[in-house]
């Protein structure tokens, strides 16, 4: 490169004095690094800009995605556990399930019966506890399939809640089975509780419609 500059300078300005050629050479030589430096900056700056913008966009992207993921996790957890509902369980046989102040479980036709107001609490995923608000008894089923009211929450009070195809709910004992079959909460055509051994999931006597209680 330097050889090119000297040769062409001499041929381009043959009539200039030697001192003028020297000054001209010095000027050309001093301008070359500046040009190279500017050219280098032009070549590097777009890549640096893209790199910084991509890193900033990636950090902003992660800052937006993280809270939403956490929010989804928290909302899912609250939905699955700790849910509390006040309901009346209206059976397919046209009775409201009630637990009287002596702990007796039966059905009633009276819509305003205070013992039919129930608090349904999710204790595990798909498992609930049903408690009569005015008698303070939990709905329970023992290993023989008998329904009774329990003052204390125990394993007999855990019921598996399932929404059936017809829109009604079924409640099966979480801990007890009969010959490998689920035992269900059920009221017969007279409003009396049925033994769990005689119930099946498809029996309409075991189907209940949760009705919202308005305060």
UniProtKB/Swiss-Prot annotation:
Region ranges (Disordered): 49-73
UniProt biased composition (Low complexity): 51-69
InterPro entries in the cross-refs: Fibroblast_GF_fam (IPR002209), IL1/FGF (IPR008996)
Glycosylation site list: 50, 203
Signal peptide limits: 1-36
Principal location: secreted
UniProt entry tagged with the keyword Glycoprotein: yes
Biological-process GO terms, alphabetical: actin cytoskeleton organization; angiogenesis; animal organ formation; animal organ morphogenesis; blood vessel morphogenesis; blood vessel remodeling; branch elongation involved in salivary gland morphogenesis; branching involved in salivary gland morphogenesis
Keywords from the UniProt entry: Glycoprotein, Growth factor, Secreted, Signal
Tissue and organ expression note: Preferentially expressed in the lung in adults.
Subcellular location: Secreted
PROSITE patterns in UniProt: HBGF_FGF
Source taxon at top rank: Eukaryota
Keyword Repeat among UniProt keywords: no
GO cellular component: cell surface; cytoplasm; extracellular space; nucleus; plasma membrane
GO MF, one annotated term: fibroblast growth factor receptor binding
Function: Plays an important role in the regulation of embryonic development, cell proliferation and cell differentiation. Required for normal branching morphogenesis. May play a role in wound healing.
Subunit (UniProt): Interacts with FGFR1 and FGFR2. Interacts with FGFBP1.
Family per similarity comment: Belongs to the heparin-binding growth factors family.
Name of this chain's protein: Fibroblast growth factor 10
């Amino acid at each position: 490169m330097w050889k090119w500059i000297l040769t062409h300078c001499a041929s381009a300005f043959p009539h200039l004095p030697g001192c003028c050629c020297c000054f001209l050479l010095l000027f050309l030589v001093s301008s070359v690094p500046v040009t190279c430096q500017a050219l280098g900056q032009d070549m590097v700056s777009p890549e640096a800009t893209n790199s910084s913008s991509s890193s900033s966009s990636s950090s902003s992207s992660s800052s937006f995605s993280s809270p939403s993921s956490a929010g989804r996790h928290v909302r899912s957890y609250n939905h699955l556990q700790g849910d509390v509902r006040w309901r009346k369980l209206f059976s397919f046989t046209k009775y409201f399930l009630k637990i009287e102040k002596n702990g007796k479980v039966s059905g009633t036709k009276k819509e305003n019966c205070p013992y039919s107001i129930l608090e349904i609490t999710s204790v595990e995923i798909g498992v609930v506890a049903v408690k009569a608000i005015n008698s303070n008894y939990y709905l329970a089923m023992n290993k023989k399939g008998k329904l009774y009211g329990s003052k204390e929450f125990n394993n007999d009070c855990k019921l598996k809640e399932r929404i059936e195809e017809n829109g009604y709910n079924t409640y099966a004992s979480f801990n007890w089975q009969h010959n490998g079959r689920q035992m269900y909460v059920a009221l017969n055509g007279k409003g009396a509780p049925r033994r769990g051994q005689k119930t099946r999931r498809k029996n309409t006597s075991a189907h209940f419609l949760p009705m919202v209680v308005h305060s």
